[in-house]
């Protein structure tokens, strides 16, 4: 082991690793994340990826960048506490969407679009927090269709998606130009690894 560490130290390019990192992440890092996201069913490129210090940081950045004080976002009746904190801090109102079979219903989403003036939708399709429900493929397609019709910004929190043994396409794969897709290493590798990536629409 001692010899191995000595070899590693000799191979390290200290001049490179002790420099400031690139603001939007190193290209090799983003290419690796793009491959990881592809395994979850979403084709993206390194140019479409932005780094964040964990999933919560990604959510705050998205809300602050794409929404304004007073905007409304649809959520599950029971949703991730972190988005409640972020929305409250930014003056964004969260609107619970009626469910059917433990996931957002078509009726509920249509009602919110027509009557609640929602600008966006926050979802956790795989192992939803706190219910752990996995959204059906039909449910994902339905959300994409309605979001497209009403021009909603969909925030797809996919931090658990790679843990799903049954492959289900993400909403972003059906609605790539209106979906902000979040993936994080904190849940699938280690909590102390505070690294998330946001896959953004090309346009």
Language model region names:
Residues 1-6, 198:
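N-terminal basic, amphipathic alpha-helical segments
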Residues 172-203:
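Active-site PLP attachment segment
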